[in-house]
């Protein structure tokens, strides 16, 4: 989970980014540190909440077995399926929009694939039921992404937004 945070810190403070023909934009070290710390907390919270959701929904989809085993498997799936997104964060060293967007779209596709493949295997349910279960997990993941974006807007509006150098 530290890969995207450290890469983003380096990228926005040392490399910077540009939009169109504009100059290179960078953040101050203090501003970047605050934003990266918030991103780190948001990543960990999102993975934890997704894992808890997977565990909570297991009863609804007929998953049998020991509750502690189910809890472990749901959390493991949340961590495992978020790994491509975390590893893709290395691209934030070079924060150019088209590069970052391309890599993160590919990583998101692979994460979705891992969820669709992993739910039936880890929860020991038929693929048909696993498809619906995985679809609900992905929906919650998308809702979590929107919640993080809204929280970012609220935090920035409260005065904790980025501070640019020039």
Where are these regions (language model features)?
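Hydrophobic alpha-helical transmembrane segments and adjacent short intramembrane/lumenal linkers
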Residues: 61-146
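Hydrophobic alpha-helical transmembrane segments in multi-pass membrane proteins
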Residues: 1-8, 43, 47, 51, ...
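Hydrophobic transmembrane alpha-helix bundles
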Residues: 20-36, 40, 106-114, 137-141, ...
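Selected alpha-helical membrane-embedding segments in polytopic membrane proteins
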Residues: 1-69
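Transmembrane helix-loop junctions in multi-pass membrane proteins
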Residues: 7-21, 25, 29, 86-99, ...
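Alpha-helical hydrophobic membrane-insertion segments
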Residues: 33, 37-38, 102, 146, ...
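Juxtamembrane boundary at the C-terminal end of a transmembrane helix
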Residues: 146-166
């Amino acid at each position: 989970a530290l890969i995207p945070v450290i890469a983003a810190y380096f990228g926005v403070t040392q490399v910077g980014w540009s939009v169109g023909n504009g100059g290179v934009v960078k953040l101050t070290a203090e501003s970047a540190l605050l934003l990266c710390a918030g991103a780190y907390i948001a990543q960990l919270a999102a993975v934890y909440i997704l894992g808890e959701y997977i565990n909570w929904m297991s009863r609804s989809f007929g998953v049998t077995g020991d509750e502690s085993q189910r809890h472990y498997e749901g959390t493991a799936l949340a961590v495992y399926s978020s790994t491509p997104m975390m590893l893709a964060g290395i691209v934030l060293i070079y924060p150019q929009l088209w590069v970052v967007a391309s890599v993160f779209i590919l990583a998101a596709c692979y994460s979705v694939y891992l969820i669709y493949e992993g739910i039936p295997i880890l929860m020991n349910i038929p693929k048909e039921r696993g498809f619906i279960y995985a679809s609900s997990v992905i929906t919650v993941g998308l809702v979590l992404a929107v919640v993080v974006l809204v929280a970012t807007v609220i935090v920035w509006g409260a005065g904790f937004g980025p501070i640019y150098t020039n």
